[in-house]
Amino acid sequence: MRVFPTYIAVSGLFGGAFAAFGATNIKGQTKLFGTSFGILAKNASYDYVIVGGGTAGLTVAARLAAQPNVSVAVIEAGSFYEIDNGNISQVPGYGANYLSFNDLTPSPVLVDWGLITEPQDGLNNRQIHYSAGKTLGGSSALNDMIFHRATKGSYQRWAELVDDDTYTWDKLLPYLKKSVDFTKPKDAATYPYDASVYSPEGGPLQVSFPNYRAPCDDFMETAFTKSGLKPIKGLNSGHLDGFAPTTFVINPADQTRSSSEAAFLQEALDTTAMTLYLRTLAKKILFDTNKTANGVLVETNGAEYTISAKKEVILSAGVFHSPQLLLLSGIGQADSLEKFGIPVISDLAGVGQNLWDHLFIFTSHEMNITTNSGVLVDPELLAEAVESYLNQQTGPLTGIGGGVVGWEKLPNRVSFSNSTNETLASFPDDFPEVEYVALAPGSNPASDPLANHFASVTAAVQSTSSRGYVKLRSADPHDAPIININALSHPADADLAVGAIKRLRQIAEATGVRVKEVLPGPEVVSDAEILEWVRNNAVNGYHASSTCAMGNSSNPDAVVDTRAKVYGVSNLRVVDASALPYLPPGHPMSSIYAFAELIAEDILSK
């Protein structure tokens, strides 16, 4: 059983299940001491300098550091989430704490960048808090832990967009497998899976099914079947055309989150000489006169210094901060750089552009069964859940409140315009338009906050056509970038959102356990009323991508090539979701891990 450090940084109800975990590594040393940390405010040099200790960054760092005589430094603006927010990231059931949606105050503040979008025209001028991990593990420490792969056709599209068949399903599958240590379920009838898409060797990332089947899962399987969706053999075989229980990045030994920090970093700290620079802001990538990246200007607690790279700088700061740092370093559209007095190193128009995201919408319902919707707010229910979690590693805290996920192209398209149909036809044939899942925590109405019988039947619109951007707010790296998701700016997305709400209502009715709809409510009927409700309540999908998009050299909007190398300079790569040429369907985590594995292998092959 993997052990976790003992840290005291807990707040409110979410501290209930905090346990005393051991704190020593395989050498008997305390992990927070030793030689794994850089000397702050002192210049130093390494073979590889990685900016951002998130999902991709720690994967690449661990793979590089595992090689003999290779020195690796990771620059991270945050620290260990076990220190900064206790066990809120570790315990799966506490993940709802990150879903602040319309609350513009980030929570917990120490592991979230607190990014706020520009007012969204398509969302009736609302601003959205965009959760993004400011911690080791990045957004893999904050997300809902759903782990599945995209469709074969979507990977084929990736390959076509960048003119490189490395990104087809067959060629990418070894990298999709490489990170994953899959644990088979005890009940294969309840949790179907395809063993051929996992590697028996496995990697450090723990992928499994939860120890606990949420009440929502039973009625959603019934509803999906009655609504015409077909059961499929898991969600990791390149098919998303039906429904199945999803796998999660949860360690089956103790039912804790398996983030890139818990998986890749903890193992690397035990076995490699990786060096961490924590609570350290990367301010600028440094270049020599030949436009070769040779270091990063950083700041820790007001002290500015340089971390030099003898071989490469690898930018893994995420979909918002990677383009921001490129722009601050002189890589981007020349006009926008000159506006801030930033010397142009490489004139790349695509930096910060082409932002993709999904759209999250929901319906809320009162049910005639217990759903565990009150488990995080009712002290008695929480105490019971904590006891089950700590003593048996089961119960509602082992999951996110729902785990059966459905996918489809909307069957009722009579209200779609010809233009919408043409737009949707441009996506790959196996690209689902909508994802469905029922979630219980957080679904109680304000009038009945402690109830335990509500559920949200939710949808994430997948085939979105609205595109946003990331821009500099100023030349000061301390200032957050300007983020505009441009949600619902494309008419096809509006048609899909209205259709998805109608379909959610059908699915909720088909559960057989619904008492009444709470939201949007029976007074919201016409397409115009539904769309207005969506504009007032929908949020982004927290799957932003493609702001440093990959492409071949003939693409004027490409920022990196197919090996993540930034055009116009040398020894600089971008390895995170920002480098994807477009957003594959579903939750992109598995694709990001695979991309990081592929690029790490490419770096080591040189």
Swiss-Prot record:
InterPro entries per the UniProt record, alphabetical: FAD/NAD-bd_sf, GMC_OxRdtase, GMC_OxRdtase_N, GMC_OxRtase_C
Source organism, top-level taxon: Eukaryota
GO biological process: secondary metabolite biosynthetic process
Catalytic activity: terremutin + A = terreate + AH2
Involved pathway(s): Secondary metabolite biosynthesis
Annotated glycan sites: 43, 69, 87, 290, 368, 418, 421, 552
Keyword line: Glycoprotein, Oxidoreductase, Signal
Gene disruption: observed consequences: Abolishes the production of terreic acid, but accumulates terremutin.
GO MF, one annotated term: flavin adenine dinucleotide binding
Cross-referenced Pfam families: GMC_oxred_C, GMC_oxred_N
Biotech relevance: Terreic acid is a metabolite with antibiotic properties. Terreic acid also acts as a selective inhibitor of human Bruton's tyrosine kinase in mast cells and other immune cells.
EC number, as in UniProt: 1.1.99.-
Signal peptide boundaries: 1-19
Family statement: Belongs to the GMC oxidoreductase family.
Function: Glucose methanol choline oxidoreductase; part of the gene cluster that mediates the biosynthesis of terreic acid, a quinone epoxide inhibitor of Bruton's tyrosine kinase. The first step of the pathway is the synthesis of 6-methylsalicylic acid (6-MSA) by the 6-methylsalicylic acid synthase atX. In the biosynthesis of 6-MSA, atX utilizes one acetyl-CoA and three malonyl-CoAs as its substrates and catalyzes a series of programmed reactions including Claisen condensation, reduction, aldol cyclization, and the hydrolytic cleavage that yields 6-MSA.
Name by which UniProt lists this protein: Glucose methanol choline oxidoreductase atC
Organism field: Aspergillus terreus (strain NIH 2624 / FGSC A1156)
